[in-house]
């Protein structure tokens, strides 16, 4: 028995394939290579069989049917249905002689063919609106896309949305693009993207975009060579720099400023507009250009020459921007996007640590654990304590890639010293468990960040009074503002539990025994 396939035109519905008997004349030429169906099918439920052939029971299972050897088969599909061609020589005229295992294989082929039809671009199922929308999906970024901030702009591709402010040659600002969906397969760092984006737009939207040079939105600039030395927002400066004629005289001295990178000369933490900021001084490398002082956020990331991504507060940077960083030090050269020395981003050892771990944007704060392990290990070794077995996880690799322990630290290094002392207690507990301490909670992390600032604001108050003020501010904060500290505290707690599970049990046991 042979089946001819036709399609009924059904308005506003998916077209159904109806099986009808082939009544072609048996004398039709066999030389034509036709579309054929090489499967035996039972009668369709509720469909009257042809009188020329035997009627079959209305059963759900497929059964072998005796076919008339005088008839040939046609498998006809309308132009809007996907299909495949099979040579006529492969068609068996006597289907009853096909063994049972062959029928099973043909069943799979038949189901595959139906799946191909249903999922083809011409299928009405695939033409529904919910298949055409641009829905964000998780895709894995390659190691080369991790440093999209430092990648040179694409040469052959024409961007749909150009840079906000034009610059010259490779120095021009790099726009933020979506990561290509067909090139991600290696790294475990995840980002959000859309499959409908252009292949040429190969930038990940989870990385920050610079406004001018290597500075993000919200940074304030002060050029020492200017007579007035006024502070100006980086957005206003970049907007003025884009005016070729009007501001040519004023901005001429800053054209190409720091094109080979900005060398960090000094840094301090200060308060600006009621917010704790970093005040950094850079040297552009040329005497005629003069020095530059900037005020930026504590979590501002920088791409450092021969080092990779760096930050003064790696824990804050990874939570805020999703970028795992080394610690930046005096003497580091911060490069602008697209700099030739910034294209060798695969040499940045910091990302080698994360290649075998899958972190989604929701738990990106877990990467903080790895970034803090270098400080824990250095603090443990400097104090004379041996590194714990659990601490060998990846701290040594991270420490090697992020510089020597003797490098310069922040002016607020006392904060780090306290934090490291608390964090490194888990390492010391590998040899002396009684010294194990619980990690800091969200409020403690918040207080650690702002205690120096509030001490400077209220010089006459002692530490306890400062804690009360910090507590009042913490209560007034919104949940969105607390989230960063909550994620960081959660990551610390999970790592402490992993390294010292018995320490947590012992704490509860001791507290219970003291109550009795």
Curated annotation (Swiss-Prot):
Primary residence: nucleus
Top-level taxon: Eukaryota
Basic and acidic residues bias (residue ranges): 166-182
Biased composition regions of type Low complexity, renumbered to the chain: 156-165
Gene Ontology terms describing biological process: negative regulation of lipid transport; negative regulation of macrophage derived foam cell differentiation; negative regulation of reactive oxygen species biosynthetic process; regulation of DNA-templated transcription; Wnt signaling pathway
Tagged with keyword Heme: no
InterPro entries, per database record: Ataxin_AXH_dom (IPR003652), Ataxin_AXH_dom_sf (IPR036096), HBP1 (IPR039655), HMG_box_dom (IPR009071), HMG_box_dom_sf (IPR036910)
Region entry Disordered, spans: 150-182
TM segment ranges: none
DNA-binding region listed in the record: 436-504
Record protein name field: HMG box-containing protein 1
Lineage: Eukaryota, Metazoa, Chordata, Craniata, Vertebrata
Gene name linked to the record: Hbp1
């Amino acid at each position: 028995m042979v089946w001819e396939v036709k399609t009924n035109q059904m308005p506003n519905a998916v077209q159904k394939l109806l099986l009808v008997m082939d009544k072609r004349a048996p004398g039709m030429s066999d030389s034509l290579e036709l579309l054929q169906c090489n499967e035996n099918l039972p009668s369709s439920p509720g469909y009257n069989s042809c009188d020329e052939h035997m009627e079959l029971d209305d059963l759900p299972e497929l059964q072998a049917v005796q076919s008339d050897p005088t008839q040939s088969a046609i498998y006809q599909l309308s132009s809007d249905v996907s299909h495949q061609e099979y040579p006529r020589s492969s068609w068996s005229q006597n289907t009853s002689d096909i063994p049972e295992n062959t029928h099973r294989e043909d069943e799979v082929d038949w189901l595959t063919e139906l799946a191909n039809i249903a999922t083809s671009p011409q299928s009405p199922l695939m033409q529904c609106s919910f298949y055409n929308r641009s829905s964000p999906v998780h895709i894995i970024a390659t190691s080369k896309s991790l440093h999209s901030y430092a990648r040179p702009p694409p040469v052959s591709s024409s961007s749909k949305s150009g840079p906000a402010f034009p610059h010259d040659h490779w120095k021009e600002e790099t726009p933020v693009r979506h990561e290509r969906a067909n090139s991600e397969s290696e790294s475990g760092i995840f980002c959000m993207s859309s499959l409908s984006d252009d292949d040429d737009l190969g930038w990940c939207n989870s990385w920050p975009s610079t406004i001018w040079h290597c500075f993000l939105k919200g940074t304030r600039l002060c050029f020492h060579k200017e007579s007035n030395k006024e502070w100006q927002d980086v957005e206003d400066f970049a907007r003025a720099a884009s005016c070729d004629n009007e501001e040519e005289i004023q901005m001429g001295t800053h054209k190409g400023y720091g094109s080979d990178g900005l060398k960090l000369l000094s840094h301090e933490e200060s308060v600006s507009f009621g917010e704790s900021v970093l005040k950094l001084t850079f040297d552009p490398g040329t005497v005629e250009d003069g020095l530059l002082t900037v005020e930026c956020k504590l979590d501002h990331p920088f791409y450092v020459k021969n080092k990779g991504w760096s930050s003064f507060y790696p824990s804050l940077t990874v939570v805020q921007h999703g970028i795992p960083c080394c610690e930046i030090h005096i003497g580091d050269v911060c490069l602008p996007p697209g700099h030739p020395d910034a294209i060798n981003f695969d040499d940045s050892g910091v990302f080698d640590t994360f290649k075998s771990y899958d972190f989604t944007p929701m738990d990106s704060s877990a990467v903080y654990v790895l970034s803090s392990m270098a400080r824990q290990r250095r603090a443990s070794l400097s104090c004379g304590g041996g590194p714990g077995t659990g601490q060998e996880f990846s701290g040594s690799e991270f420490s090697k890639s992020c510089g020597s322990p003797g490098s310069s630290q922040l002016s607020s290094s006392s904060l780090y010293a306290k934090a490291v002392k608390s964090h490194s207690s888990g390492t010391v507990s590998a040899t002396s468990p009684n010294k194990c301490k619980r990690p800091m909670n969200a409020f403690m992390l918040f207080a650690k960040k702002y205690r120096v600032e509030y001490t400077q604001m209220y010089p006459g108050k002692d530490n306890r009074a400062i804690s009360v003020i910090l507590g009042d501010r913490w209560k007034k904060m919104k949940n969105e503002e607390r989230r960063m500290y909550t994620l960081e505290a959660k990551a610390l707690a999970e790592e402490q539990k992993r390294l010292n599970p018995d320490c947590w049990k012992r704490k509860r046991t001791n507290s219970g025994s003291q109550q009795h």
